[in-house]
């Protein structure tokens, strides 16, 4: 009841066909090994790209925070200069009015 395929020699293959098939098999194995190696290299490159993208994202977050902080500081400086000029003008105007009533 055990059905095994007949040995290669009984199928009618000669040594040349077997050798040609083995060479083809070796060629396919070499190509597959090369493909697996390329896949592994690509995976490494993809991992590097993911890491670089994460670092760029972190750097952009820091940049945005710094830009917002600088914008606030510049706005505060600009407004304080305006308020200072208004205050000095107001004091001068009141002083002028007060002097004119004397």
Swiss-Prot record:
Keywords: Coiled coil
MF terms in GO: SNAP receptor activity; syntaxin binding
Gene Ontology BP terms: vesicle fusion
Protein name listed in UniProt: Synaptobrevin-like protein 5
A Pfam family this chain is assigned to: Synaptobrevin
Native species: Caenorhabditis elegans
One GO CC term, this protein: SNARE complex
Domain of life, per lineage: Eukaryota
Residue intervals of the v-SNARE coiled-coil homology domain: 17-77
